[in-house]
Regions:
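Adenine nucleotide-associated cytosolic modules
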Residues: 1-166
Length: 166
């Protein structure tokens, strides 16, 4: 949607590769591209949608120094889709302190109904173990209780839909 809306400049940061467990919730994840760079897959898709898009692709896992460097560019909006707690907490804290507009994705694993998605303040999330952990650590480590816009689903996780991996 963002690329289709005419955004002129975008940076995507992701050091991860497609894994079979991503297929129930991540657009780039297909049965045919396991092991491929998520950032490169999304870059190809974004450029196919909007060939005029000025796109910076960083194929690395995010770290505090990288976040601080990217925030210096003062982006108009930040979308966080990090799925690991520690880097997510650090990213949210730095973005929050910068005063920039940010929206953060919460857990989608074991949730199947996209019509249940909501955008709310993080303090209003429930039935989301991932959001619960994010809230807990933001509060404990940084005193942040609210003021973070998030996308989450109040749908109860469906345990039967989980795929166990090693």
């Amino acid at each position: 949607f963002i690329a289709r809306s005419g955004v002129g400049k975008m940076t995507i940061i992701d050091g991860d590769v497609v894994d079979p467990t991503n297929r129930n919730r991540q657009l780039p994840a297909l049965a045919t591209n396991h092991g491929e760079s998520k950032a490169l897959i999304m870059a190809d898709r974004l450029k196919a949608i909007n060939p005029e898009l000025e796109l910076e692709v960083i194929r690395e896992f995010i770290n505090p120094a990288m976040v601080e460097q990217q925030l210096l560019h003062r982006p108009s909006y930040i979308i966080d889709a990090i799925d690991s707690i520690t880097p997510k907490i650090t990213f949210i804290k730095l973005a929050f302190e910068s005063g920039l507009s940010v929206v953060s994705s919460m857990g989608a694993g074991a949730k199947l109904d996209p019509t249940r998605l909501q955008v709310v303040d993080i303090s209003e999330t429930y039935n989301c173990p991932f959001a619960q952990q994010v809230r807990k650590q933001l509060k404990r480590n940084y005193g942040i209780r609210k003021g973070i816009k998030v996308v989450f689903s109040p749908e109860e996780p469906i345990k039967e839909s989980l795929m166990l991996t090693d």
